[in-house]
Amino acid sequence: MPKTIIIQGSSKSFGNTHKIVKYLSSNEQYDVIDLKTKNIGPFDYDFANATDDFLPLMEKIITNYDTIIFATPVYWYSMSGILKDFFDRLSDLLHYRKELGRQMKGKRMAMISNSNENDLKDGFTMPFKASASYLGMTYLGDTHTW
């Protein structure tokens, strides 16, 4: 049976994004990773953050899950900074750990966002859709709540 994980990308572990994630994970028994609890540095071409939590976390995700749901608040018309760092670090899978990155192909991705507005600005979903396409993943869709 396919397994799903929700990656909670909020700078606030117990805010509105957490409420959504908690509801979904309890009803569907999805596993959750709170990026706020992880030490994930920014991407750099020198691979200076090779020993942080990103690569072990990606090994766990790629090995154990078929579907990844990203949950993020809207910060300044975009995904949260903590989730953006995570997305930037996907470059590690294209440069330094290609064999791991290739295993993203065929997996599924979805996105949940929330803010104090009832809709998203144009372009918000583009990084999710484009990343899924580039990595050979199926983009299942997205939803926004407020």
Stretches found by the model and what they are:
Residues 1-100, 140-144:
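N-terminal beta1-alpha1-beta2 submodule of the flavodoxin-like/Rossmannoid cofactor-binding fold
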Residues 99-142:
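Short, glycine-/small-residue-rich phosphate/pyrophosphate-handling segment
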